[in-house]
Amino acid sequence: MRKTAGDLIKNIILSGFLLVIYSCGQLEVDIEVVNLFDPADANYSIPGTEVLDWPTEGHTIDSTSAVFTWRHSDQNYHYDATHEVDYAERIFYRYRLNASIWSPWNSGEALLQQDLHFWTFDTLTGLHVLKLDYMEDIDYNFAVMSKYPTNIQEDDWPTISFTVDAFDGVELLISPGQVFADSGTVFYVNAKLIDVTDFMGIHLDVSYDNSFMQLLDYALESDSTDFLLQSAGHLINFIDNDTQNGRFQLDLGVAGGAVTGVSGTGNIVRLIFEHTGPRGQSVISISSESTVRDVYNNSVIEHIFSGVVSIW
């Protein structure tokens, strides 16, 4: 069909209109990409941790549990439902208690896939919450550090020192009360007496999950013998080590020496374990059948505390 000059003009106008639409479509998808983990981004901040809840620096708490809550110190990295990327769940953290090893790095995403119980991530607030139990009456130093997925780490991470003094009187406990170890490694705990007076004998009954850990060995270390032999006596002990059922029993007495017996704080025996089960937590328990007696054969134990092993 023969095209008129009017048809040609219409085609030119239509082509121009389509070109405008195409150009606008290109502009709509050509948006700016924001990456707060990239140091080149205008809103980038170095890794920094803001602690919202933990014991007061230098203070003494009267509880065997402590809660620590933290997040990034820059609100641009906090949880925001309008953000295309949830930066809060992608930041990695690790913590350390006293001289123990650093925990593995865990992001919020990683914690949501695990079942650690004691360390959780709240998707609605973007907060990390850590609860530590079985803390004994000693001084503590806690630290937490962050890093980005790009492996840029925090240089000046927060730390705090505090003291636990939860109970008065004679205590029999697993020490340290919190043990952190890598999967498949060997670790140890001590059975410990605190603030005992005129001690002469103990029946210790310890149980553990032998599908999680195996007792490799036990020993009276030098710190134990120094404590137990301070009255210049000698030690008599009987041991029942039932690894098949996860139970260790020790009957120990201090014979001879000073009439006043042993007083103070010290370790009784060291228990050396190997982790053999799944990752997670497991308790090393001291039975209520355990007893501590003084030179007059009186039972003097007032508090018994178990311990917990956390395997990363």
Residue ranges and their predicted role:
Residues 1-2, 25:
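N-terminal hydrophobic targeting signals that begin at the initiator methionine
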Residues 2-13:
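Bacterial N-terminal signal peptides that target proteins for export
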Residues 14, 61, 88, 243-245, ...:
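A generic structural signal for short, non-catalytic loop/turn and secondary-structure boundary residues
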Residues 14, 76, 148-149, 277-279:
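N-terminal processing/targeting junctions
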Residues 20-23:
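C-terminal motif of bacterial Sec signal peptides marking the signal peptidase cleavage site
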Residues 25-167:
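Low-complexity, disordered linker/stalk regions enriched in Pro/Thr/Ser/Gly
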Residues 165-312:
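Acidic, low-complexity intrinsically disordered segments
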